[in-house]
Amino acid sequence: MSGTPAVTFYRWKDLALEKVTDSLDRRLITAERMMLAQVYLKKGCIVPKHQHENEQLTYILEGALRFWIGDDGKQEIVVKAGEVLHIPSNIAHRAQALDDTLDVDVFSPPRWDWLNHTDTYFHRKEK
């Protein structure tokens, strides 16, 4: 049937592992209106404060992440294996891996800064 979008099948193990920093690697699957990311964070890894238009779901498969939410970072949430955090569009957040952590992030729309490698906030040093 012409006009019917084709389905696509993926295996994580077949996708390239991108080294973002010394303590963070990821694999990406991108569709027209969403993105799925498998993210590996070493214990102690810091994701500096940032915000984006993309709505985000973070599902922790292994380990745990501590999030600081909002411009002031006063809301603190620890997300452990089996738990999911929803971050609405344009909400500032930062995170720290409390253990070696594997998470799956869903973004809508896709994170074009991740795809075109303009996500420079990963390399900012935080105090």
Predicted regions and their residues:
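Histidine-centered metal-chelating micro-motifs
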Residues: 46-48, 66, 84-94
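A short, N-terminal "cap"/entry segment at the start of jelly-roll beta-barrel domains
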Residues: 1-33, 37, 120-127
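Ligand-binding loop in jelly-roll beta-barrel domains
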Residues: 89-113
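Short acidic-glycine-tyrosine-enriched beta hairpin
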Residues: 73-89
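Short, conserved beta-strand element in jelly-roll/cupin
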Residues: 40-42, 52-67
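Conserved short histidine dyad/triad with adjacent acidic residue
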Residues: 20-22, 37-51
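A cytosolic small-molecule/anion-sensing beta-strand core signal
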Residues: 61-62, 80-81, 99
